Amino acid sequence: MNLLWMLVITLVTLQVSIFCTTVFLHRCKTHRGLELNPVVGALLHLELSLFTGVIPRQWAAVHRKHHHFSDEPGDPHSPYIYGLWTVLLGNYYFYRKEANDQAMVRKYTPDWKDDALDKLPFMNYAALVGMAIFMLMFGVWWGLAAWTVHVVLYIFLNSSVNSICHMVGYRNFDNKATNLQSIAFLTAGEGLHNNHHQYPTSARLSLRGHEIDPAWPLIRLLEACKLAKVRQLPMAKAAA
């Protein structure tokens, strides 16, 4: 397999992981903005487990704590507290520090209900299977290199939302988060962060006519196929 195809497959896998993160982890499991068909939810969960290693309950807890203390003391990764570059480059450290605190995870996810995959004892190590899949596709060393690129870019794109999209960009609402359409294109809409902080339970992140939330058409398609149900949207006047 030539390097171009390896790069294409790696970047496609990256974007699939990004879409799974925003649709399953963020909008569905963390904020309850939509419901997913159990099979669809399980597939998105499996993709994330294999190719990111994220444990959904930990992710939801850290993110809910971020909203609770947004850009105030207690925020797990505020660039106003730690600095933009520190969060951009060190967001994974801040995330792991919080995610490893079991008391914090329980506190911020009292409503959590494990799905079938959560209950499997080996799911914490599923990312090793994902790495093996890359190696089977591309060979050991090229596969390891492609997997590393995928993981680093995934972490960096998530970090960019938590850092850049709190300090750089425009605001529709009076909160410290910002909107950046360029980052929204790369993160399936997550870069519309000012909108999200105003209406955190909304299944749609775009509110103005010029804003594009790439994950929203996918959610609408799933809903049209009876595989998802949107539960929350922003107030009509906010989306004007």
What residue spans do the PLM features occupy?
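Non-catalytic, topology-defining segments of multipass membrane proteins
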Residues: 1-160, 164, 202-240
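Active-site-proximal inter-transmembrane loops
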Residues: 108-115, 172-192, 196-199
